């Protein structure tokens, strides 16, 4: 496997970075560009930006901040939010994003995955999956999680959607484990291991990082390609250079920092 990736996640609302707990009660964390520059300087391998209001509000991502970020950073970044057709995806990529991520729009129209893969290549197409464990013990998919008042519980099992999205042409997947989001108790290793067994494309873990050992655990125990986190990076609780040094000491290969 290639070097494991450390990926700060920036949830965007109204032109600012915000962060919630279990996808609720978001608070302001700072300016988009300032945070992007900070993470680039610290040695982040890439960035992910989620315009969390776009899909619930029926709009596309705001291209202006995408262009600002692209002008100022030189590491790859991925953008998600209301990307429901090839034209919108093309505009986001032309604004400077390296990859586009789709979540709710693909659940409404799965063929979108194939359309984007055909238009831009699978390497540009990331499928994000918001997953939660229900009372029957099954993990199932949620849609429109950027707005708690509009979030929809779907009958589709997470594992079934992983298999379908991969078949349709997803080049990478991000599994957002909603039960663990923002609580800093560690990644959902059990769920990630089941997804890893099905997923032949790069898999990124999201939700639950609270200390450096959590990153080591998810790489060692779930064999993911990258680990995404937000609150521990935004707050400064885990500086990226120290995290990479820690992982190297655990014999986990990571890229050199900037």
UniProtKB/Swiss-Prot annotation:
Gene Ontology terms for molecular function: imidazoleglycerol-phosphate synthase activity; lyase activity
EC number(s) from the headed UniProt entry: 4.3.2.10
Residues of the active site: 11, 130
GO annotations of cellular component type: cytoplasm
Pfam families: His_biosynth
Localization: Cytoplasm
Classification via NCBIfam families: hisF
Name the record gives this protein: Imidazole glycerol phosphate synthase subunit HisF
Protein source organism: Xanthomonas axonopodis pv. citri (strain 306)
Phylogenetic classification of the source organism: Bacteria, Pseudomonadati, Pseudomonadota, Gammaproteobacteria, Lysobacterales
Gene encoding the protein: hisF
């Amino acid at each position: 496997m290639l070097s494991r990736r450390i990926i700060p996640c920036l949830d965007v609302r109204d032109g600012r970075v915000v962060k919630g707990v279990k996808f609720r009660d978001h608070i302001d964390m700072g300016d988009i560009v300032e945070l992007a520059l900070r993470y680039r300087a610290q040695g982040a391998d890439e960035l992910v930006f989620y315009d969390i209001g776009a899909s619930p509000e029926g709009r596309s991502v705001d291209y202006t901040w995408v262009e600002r970020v692209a002008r100022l950073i030189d590491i790859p970044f991925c953008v998600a939010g209301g990307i429901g057709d090839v034209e919108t995806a093309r505009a986001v990529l032309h604004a400077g994003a390296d990859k586009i991520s789709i979540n709710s729009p693909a659940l409404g129209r799965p063929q979108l995955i194939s359309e984007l893969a055909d238009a831009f290549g699978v390497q540009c197409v990331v499928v994000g999956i918001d997953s939660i464990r229900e009372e029957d013990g099954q993990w199932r998919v949620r849609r429109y999680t950027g707005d708690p008042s509009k979030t929809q519980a779907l009958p589709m099992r997470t594992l079934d959607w992983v298999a379908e999205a991969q078949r349709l042409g997803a080049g990478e997947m991000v599994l957002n484990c909603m039960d663990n989001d923002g609580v800093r108790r560690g990644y959902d290793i059990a769920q990630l291991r089941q997804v890893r067994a099905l997923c032949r494309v790069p898999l990124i873990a999201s939700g639950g990082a609270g200390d450096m050992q959590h990153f080591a655990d998810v790489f060692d125990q779930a064999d993911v390609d990258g680990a995404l986190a937000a609150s521990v990076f935004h707050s400064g609780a885990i500086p990226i250079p120290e995290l990479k040094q820690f992982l190297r000491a655990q014999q986990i290969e990571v890229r050199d920092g900037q």
